[in-house]
Amino acid sequence: MIVCWRTVHVPKVERDRFRAWIEENRRLREEHGILFELVLGRSARQNPAKTLQPSDPESGEEGDLVVVTAWASHDAFDSWIETPDRDRLTDSDVHRSVGYCPITRYDVVGGYLNLDGISAVAEFPKEEP
């Protein structure tokens, strides 16, 4: 399994549409082998003082999100990149409104997922007005 990490710059006014676009295209991505896709936004709550601190946050007006996806293999991901279905998805106003950094691939070399625990606490915060 591989995990792909990509920073994306989504203007604040486009964030709801971007998240909806991800969800609307979920089925198609799953048909092409995606295992999961998460969109991460920097939390206002950061580390306690006794731990290493993150750098200053980005502007409150616009900022970066991180998109994390998982695929069964490099071949599965490469097949997705080459499919005309992906080309159709990226030919949209929502996709063009976002700034994309390069994708970095990571091989999964260890760890675990507690799926029952994730299901029990899953909540997705709404964007503040």
Language-model regions, residue ranges each:
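Short, surface-exposed ligand-recognition loops at beta-strand->loop->(often short) alpha-helix junctions
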Residues: 9-19
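Feature marks short, surface-exposed loop/turn motifs that line or immediately flank catalytic pockets
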Residues: 12, 43, 74-75
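Acidic/histidine-enriched, glycine/proline-rich intrinsically disordered or flexible terminal extensions
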Residues: 105-129
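Hydrophobic beta-strand positions in extracellular immunoglobulin-like domains
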Residues: 8-9, 71
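Active-site-flanking beta-strand signature of metal-NTP-handling nucleotidyl enzymes
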Residues: 2-8, 66
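Short acidic, gly/pro-rich beta-turn/loop elements at beta-sheet edges
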Residues: 16-18, 77-79, 113
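An amphipathic, aromatic/His-enriched active-site/gating alpha helix that lines ligand/cofactor pockets
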Residues: 24-38, 54-64, 68-108
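Carbohydrate-binding/catalytic loop surfaces
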Residues: 43-55
